Amino acid sequence: MKTFLAKKETVQPKWYLIDAAGVPLGRLAVKAANIIRGRHKATYTPTVDTGDYVIVINAAKVALTGKKEEQNEYMFFSGFVGGESRRKVSLMRERHPEFIIEHAVKGMLPKNRIAAKMLTKLRVFGGETHTHEANNPVKVTV
């Protein structure tokens, strides 16, 4: 019996919906990353993008345990001398709540060329509504 290898042409992606309200960030990111990679399918192949699309709503209400809200920082660098800036999670939650989840999921994807394509399958929205109702997403509990 030969090992099954998925082909790019045979993959039929589905859409999944995850509600982030009150869910710990790490658990949410693991679930989303596994769906995006296709790890939940029997046809998973590491070298082919077999993953599905993930819609995350209520990104502003994601839970962080402990004192991470005040202590954790995101570092940005402009490329110029003295161009390093840091922003706390609490500030990012107010301004760009989508960034927190996108950053966590990106860190859980492989560091290769396929990961850039996989990351385009993640759609994060700060509020209750999203623009992908026509795709009939399946609700996933975390």
UniProtKB/Swiss-Prot annotation:
Record keywords: Ribonucleoprotein, Ribosomal protein
InterPro entries (UniProt xref): Ribosomal_uL13, Ribosomal_uL13_bac-type, Ribosomal_uL13_sf
MF (Gene Ontology): mRNA binding; structural constituent of ribosome
CDD domains documented for this protein: Ribosomal_L13
One Pfam family matching this protein: Ribosomal_L13
Cellular-component GO terms for this entry: cytosolic large ribosomal subunit
GO biological process, one term: negative regulation of translation
Domain of life: Bacteria
NCBIfam families, per database record: rplM_bact
Family, similarity comment: Belongs to the universal ribosomal protein uL13 family.
Subunit structure: Part of the 50S ribosomal subunit.
Role summary: This protein is one of the early assembly proteins of the 50S ribosomal subunit, although it is not seen to bind rRNA by itself. It is important during the early stages of 50S assembly.
Matches recorded under PANTHER family: LARGE RIBOSOMAL SUBUNIT PROTEIN UL13M, RIBOSOMAL PROTEIN L13
Protein name: Large ribosomal subunit protein uL13
Name of the gene: rplM
